[in-house]
Regions:
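Long, low-complexity C-terminal extensions of enzymes
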Residues: 132-141, 147-219
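Hydrophobic/aromatic residues within transmembrane alpha-helices
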Residues: 4-5, 60-61, 158, 197
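Acidic, divalent-metal-coordinating active-site segment for phosphoryl/phosphodiester hydrolysis
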Residues: 54-60
Length: 219
């Protein structure tokens, strides 16, 4: 997963890649060091991904920097041989030879980057909501609906973690996540989120607090 691969120097995706941190939808928060690497993505992309769990394809992964190289799926088996056959060549040069035409130009996230930065760069969850409503676009409506369906507790935890994560070391971020995990897994929202998503699979969690639309979150 991302928690391991993001720290590697070479992060390869294929045309079938899907990357996401969907934890707020099950009453949890992005962990495995996400509070360290998400705030270090360009602009407010990390906050957007952490709060909404938006799914990235290969083009988006390359655009955000979560992936460094693209190799077609049918070329993956040849990566090891190509590296072994060209021991004097830098790894990135070998990977680029295998890439063919990179899909990065097709990033859908790049198309809404300005709106992402403006809305999710807001200082509070309440302000993020206001800015999304102000935008009045299909992307903003989708993002707002996702937030309103997520656990309010998880959104608050995630926003706070990511806001502080930029100033923390990886060790500090992992420590904070571990401490929060020990308490969060005992909360009603986590149990309800797991029930709705993984056990009964009815996708209708009954969170303990009102939704984002109920305006109970910090403003």
């Amino acid at each position: 997963g991302l928690g391991l691969s993001v720290h590697g120097g070479f992060r390869v995706v294929t045309e079938g890649a899907v990357l996401a941190m969907p934890e707020t939808g099950i009453g949890f928060f992005p962990d495995i060091g996400a509070s360290y690497f998400l705030p270090r993505l360009p602009g407010a992309i990390g906050m957007y991904l952490g709060l909404t769990g938006h799914r990235l394809d290969a083009a988006d992964a390359l655009y955000t920097g979560l992936a460094t190289h693209f190799v077609p799926r049918d070329g993956l088996e040849g990566v090891g041989d190509a590296l072994a056959d060209n021991p004097g060549d830098p790894v990135d040069v070998v990977l680029n030879r295998l890439a063919g035409r990179s899909p990065v130009a097709g990033s859908r996230l790049a198309e809404v980057r300005g709106d992402v930065d403006w809305a999710f760069g807001a200082p509070s969850l309440g302000e993020i909501e206001k800015r999304l409503r102000h935008l009045d676009t299909a992307w903003a409506a989708d993002a707002l609906a996702t937030l309103e369906s997520a656990s309010p507790q998880s959104l608050e935890i995630t926003h706070a973690l990511l806001a502080r994560g930029r100033q923390r070391t990886l060790r500090e971020c992992l420590g904070a996540e571990l401490a929060l995990t020990r308490t969060t897994i005992r909360t009603p929202d986590f149990l309800e989120g797991v029930r709705a998503a993984l056990v009964d699979k009815d996708r209708t969690p009954n969170w303990q607090r009102a939704s984002l639309g109920g305006r109970t979150l910090p403003s």
